[in-house]
Amino acid sequence: MQKYFNLEWKEIEMFEIKIKLTTESCCLIGNQTESFSVGGVDQSTTIDENGRPIIHGSAFKGALRNIVREQEKKEGQMEKTKEYVKCIINEILEKYRSEDIVKTEKIEKMILNLENKVNSKDLKAEYIFGMEGINGLPRIFCSDFRVIESKDKKIGDYFLIDTKNCIEEINGNILSNPRTYKVIKPGVEFEGVIRFYTPFPIAAKEAKELEDSMEKELRCALELFNNGIYGIGNSKSRGYGQIRVEFCND
């Protein structure tokens, strides 16, 4: 029986990292505009169905991917993650090279793409976040980060209204354009989960060793949020987006 491109593999959860996230500065997540009113805000951080702030998993995942991308440029960093990515790409190639899979033009192109990547010195650790054009690749999933509720806090206690000047040049003139933002206050606590799934279990001992090493490297990358260099959301150059992360399942 011939198999086609969209193979269905059962995903296996390799590890889970539960995270408590605390805002250290004001944070502006997403680009949620509110209905205009005199004295209203120009831009608001995203909110959930109950009106509380929310940090969408895609925003956190994108910020983490940026850290991994920056770290792997440094010698000796993210090496075990790269090794795991190489093992997985070889697993995918083995499956797609099998004789019972129809070699469509799309699959042939994908195989060539993977062969080039696995044999390249530029094999990237960030491929654990997914690879364009490749189905079934192991990847990181990130939940939304939701507020840790407190009986003492009302909806308004999570937000600040902040005004910053936006400098614009119009017809050779430098103009100051004040803009108002509804942002998350410093000190607001959120919780969320990162999970890593793979449809390709490799040899038990090798898999366990790589899993432990890769999780350790990912935790080290997450801890870099705490040094003040990396942040999340918009307007980081203006001081927004500073956070602190703690691991809840240590």
What are the functions of these language-model segments?
Residues 175-177:
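A short, acidic, amphipathic alpha-helical segment used as a generic capping/interface helix at domain edges
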Residues 171-172:
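Surface/interface-facing alpha-helical segments and adjacent flexible terminal/loop regions used
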Residues 1-159, 165, 179-250:
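RNA-binding basic/glycine-rich loop and surface signature characteristic of RAMP-family CRISPR effectors
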